[in-house]
Amino acid sequence: GLGNVWKFPYMAGKYGGAAFILIYLVFLVLLGLPVLVCEFAVGRASRKSTARAFHDLEPEGANFHNFSYMSMVSNYVLMMFYTMVAGWMLYYCYAMAAGRLAGKDSTQVADYFTRLQESAGTMTLWMVIVVVLSFGVCSLGVQRGLEKITKVMMMCLLALIAVLAIHSLTLDGAMEGVKFYLVPDFTSMKEIGIGNVIFGALSQAFFTLSIGAGSMTIFGSYLGKDRSLLGESIHITVLDTFVALMAGLIIIPACFAFGVEPGAGPGLVFI
């Protein structure tokens, strides 16, 4: 997802590379996985969306249903964020296909992203396109629409990641990026601030699994009684982590090869 391909590489670059990744993996196992199981459990037990799940499951007199209101607000805010970033990516696919980025160096591509952010009209247009496409997929339902399309797109994503990772590792200077990405340097973590690194790793662990906002409760409501909640959660966490680590293995070495700051921020993947 976007949390892996777009956000994880620049978070790893910003917070010190391998040291950040180690802390991130610890939070995934200790907090991310259990919360994911819990959200699936709530969804499967209630067979309802986040808006009604806690109303149906809570004991009489309890106030767990208050979470549903915060959850719905969080999901709307999250979709505002996701649709904008997805719009950036769709726009870059169009720009690449149209040859607008052909022959440009990293500085020129970075300027191109800056100009995109300065154009509210362009960003709004591509965000609307993403929303329309998303509604089209969701209108088919989870199993007939989202599940089928996701299977095809995931296979394409994994194949693309494999090709790009191999190419990135063959670039001149890429091994310095691999060292930064895979060899922990706790000295740099102290310079950045241990608290900042821990908070960044924790927020990324929750963000990448889409937990805490109740969205996984919706998917849990479609899980059959024969499916293991722990097993499904482990599969999701492992695949999610694999994609994140591979995305970093593409972006970080390429940054060192082209002289781009690995912690350059949200525009890093577009450079």
Question: Residue locations for each model-derived region?
Answer:
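Transmembrane alpha-helical segments of multi-pass membrane transport proteins and ion-pumping complexes
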Residues: L2, G32-L36, R44, Y76-G87, ...
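Inter-helical loop and helix-membrane interface segments of multi-pass membrane transporters/permeases
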Residues: M11-Y15, A45-M70, T83-Q143, D172-F199, ...
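Hydrophobic core segments of alpha-helical transmembrane domains in multi-pass membrane transport
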Residues: Y24-L33, S74-A97, W126-L140, M155-S168, ...
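Juxtamembrane transmembrane-helix boundary signature
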Residues: I23-P59, A254, F258
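Transmembrane helix-boundary motif of multi-pass solute transporters/channels
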Residues: G1-F27, E176, G214-G220, E232-I234, ...
